[in-house]
Amino acid sequence: DYPTVGGPVTAFTELTPDLYYSDGSLGTLKIPSIGLTVKVYEGTGSAPLLKGAGHFTGTTAWAGNYCVAGHNRGVRNDFGKIHTLHTGDTITLTTPMGTRSYSVTSVTKISDTDTSMLEATADNCITLFTCVENQPAYRWCVRAVSR
């Protein structure tokens, strides 16, 4: 008998300098059903979100659960319509690693303290987050799995 290794198997790609484009972005996110095309930058603070969507630092750069935040109003409202997505809608991510298409599986309202959807996964998926307008204690969370 061999000992069991604890915890589920997860996929993870380390963010390395070669995964940045010359313009400083990590890639481009497209959601045709809401007419969105936005570049993704590293970090979820004010500087990256003023340029586009922000990749959560410490989450995977490709394999596994790729996590992205975006504003939903104001100067940049890139994620203003993500709560209107439907199961089966397509999300496409293009990075130096390639292009991957995802299919939306859930659109949920979560507490702003709920970090469970940021956790690494075994399957390739993308998770989008944005604020809920006039409800600062909540976030919209969209999960889509690789096709």
Q: What name fits each language-model region?
A:
Residues 1-147:
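Solvent-exposed, non-transmembrane regions of membrane-associated and secreted proteins
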